[in-house]
């Protein structure tokens, strides 16, 4: 299954690049692949694609991407053979409360509250919750984020603590906290 998933992953990433290039003239932001799930066996595999943009993705955009991918699958005999005659294709955005899986997702969540598990230089594991105030993940050799932790003291007063800079390679998981 890994060979199938790897080949589909490469094909879908290339297709996303073509899709983004074609749509960039109309001002639509680039779409990127967050995750790919391949389930089932021939002749009816199920291909689930999680897609995102730096500013979020709409249901309409997911439907457009699904049509684009379906056409790309149909035009490529190798891919048709991998997914089978009766394949299912679903394109959606990552769900609320799911861990961040792609570095560019941090861009979309700048300003939001995150809960992050990470390791320090001595490999000790820590957890911090704070507002995402800085994101440097594109075109850099050392991608990082900066969180501004908040401590709620008695009387519900929020006390701001020193910002925490976290290198992406030290982050074990990051989840966007739902705020009401």
Swiss-Prot record:
Major place of residence: cytoplasm
Location within or outside the cell: Cytoplasm
Family designation: Belongs to the RimP family.
Record keyword Cytoplasm present: yes
PANTHER family, A to Z: RIBOSOME MATURATION FACTOR RIMP
Alphabetically ordered keywords of this record: Cytoplasm, Ribosome biogenesis
Membrane-crossing segments per the record: none
Entry's Gene Ontology BP terms: ribosomal small subunit assembly; translation
Example of a GO cellular component annotation carried by this entry: cytosol
InterPro entries xrefs: Ribosome_maturation_RimP (IPR003728), RimP_C (IPR028998), RimP_N (IPR028989), RimP_N_sf (IPR035956)
Protein name per UniProt: Ribosome maturation factor RimP
Coiled-coil spans in chain: none
Function: Required for maturation of 30S ribosomal subunits.
